[in-house]
């Protein structure tokens, strides 16, 4: 992993992370339920009177500390992931529509999921380090030899349940995101890799 990335690679990373955070904000504004980690951020935000972006950044910092016993090493992308996604959520969410009709809420959740997929494709193609949560999951997988899918599912269910108990919003949007995000990320990762060929 390069610690001195090329300008175009860094640009792809930054743009991707901002798109990712904007996608999160679009889903939040829909009001129909959010991604598991965002449910946790909402819950923490409610308890401490923080914005969702502030709570998201807090979670990222805590998770990075959990890298230490796993001997994972953050990259440029790891640090920027923690900062930019949280910033994008707080900057973009107030300017987004907050629909009341369910059909428009569903459309907004789908749009947000697509944006998260596009953003993921960008930042993963840049290959400058995993996000805090992804690095923690892969580190746990390496240490425990438990399949990554099972590790990811277990952690996200725990994050979801804690967030829900703290007041985060679990709903149809959460289920839609959980079902679609894998295929959407895979699609846009393939497309961005073809376009930029950074990897």
Label for each model-derived stretch:
Residues 1-199:
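Core subunits and conserved enzymes of cellular information-processing
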